[in-house]
């Protein structure tokens, strides 16, 4: 899909009314981890995107629309949401009980204290490979600085080679890894990798 010359890329804070599209994008970004969590929370017969939407409609929660920035394309006053980043300050609670779900436990071990944690970043397929993802990552850096943080962190699957290379190109480096517990809903096997970028 070619972007028209008069299309304008913009970033804006998400609103509660955006939570359905946030759920769709977060499902993409998590490569099955969100689907696993939402399936566990769903009522019998409930669409898991309904669960994701409901979770992101919450306020004063880490996984909230309040921690989401959307990237949009605007043309003639019409806005199309094409991607998003969900990020928040990561403060590790050393007294917290360890994650008791074996599928989720590896990810809970991959936390970088006092970092701006990018927990989800995604674009819809038609808008990939156009530099928009890099712009979203740069936007996260600006937001981290505004919050007084000097590093960013994220988790990537080692088998997601393209994403890992992008993060390395943007200055992220590996600091830890944990083996994934395989599950049919999770798209990758191998290791989950914690990557960090210092910005101050």
Language-model segments: residues:
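Conserved acetyl-CoA-binding loop-helix of GNAT-fold acetyltransferases
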Residues: 123, 129-142, 146, 165-169
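Conserved acyl-donor/pantetheine-binding loop and adjacent beta-alpha core of acyl/acetyltransferases
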Residues: 86-120
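Conserved GNAT acetyl-CoA-binding A-motif
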Residues: 116, 137, 144-155
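A short helix-loop-beta-strand connector motif used in the catalytic cores of GNAT acetyltransferases and
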Residues: 56-70, 90-95, 117
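Conserved GNAT-fold acetyl-CoA-binding loop/helix
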Residues: 31-56, 66-67
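C-terminal "cap" of GNAT-fold acetyltransferases
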Residues: 103-104, 150-153, 157-164, 169-170, ...
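Conserved N-terminal entry element of GNAT/NAT acetyltransferase domains
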Residues: 1-20, 28, 33-40, 197-200
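Glycine-rich acetyl-CoA-binding "A-motif" of GNAT/NAT acetyltransferases
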Residues: 77-83, 162
């Amino acid at each position: 899909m070619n972007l028209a010359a008069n299309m304008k890329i913009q970033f804006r804070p998400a609103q509660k009314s955006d939570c359905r599209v946030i759920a769709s994008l977060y499902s993409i970004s998590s490569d099955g981890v969100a689907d696993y969590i939402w399936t566990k929370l769903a009522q019998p017969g409930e669409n898991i995107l309904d669960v994701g939407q409901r979770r992101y409609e919450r306020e004063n929660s880490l996984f909230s629309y309040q921690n989401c920035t959307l990237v949009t394309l605007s043309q003639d006053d019409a806005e199309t949401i094409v991607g998003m980043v969900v990020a928040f300050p990561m403060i590790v609670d050393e007294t917290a009980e360890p994650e008791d779900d074996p599928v989720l436990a590896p990810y809970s071990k991959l936390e970088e204290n006092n970092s701006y944690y990018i927990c989800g970043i995604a674009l819809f397929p038609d808008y990939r490979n156009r530099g928009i993802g890099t712009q979203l990552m740069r936007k996260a850096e600006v937001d981290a600085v505004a919050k007084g943080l000097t590093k960013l962190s994220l988790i990537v699957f080692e088998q997601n080679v393209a994403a890992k290379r992008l993060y390395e190109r943007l200055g992220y480096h590996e600091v830890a890894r944990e083996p994934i517990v395989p599950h049919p809903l999770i798209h990758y096997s191998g290791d989950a990798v914690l990557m960090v970028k210092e910005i101050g």
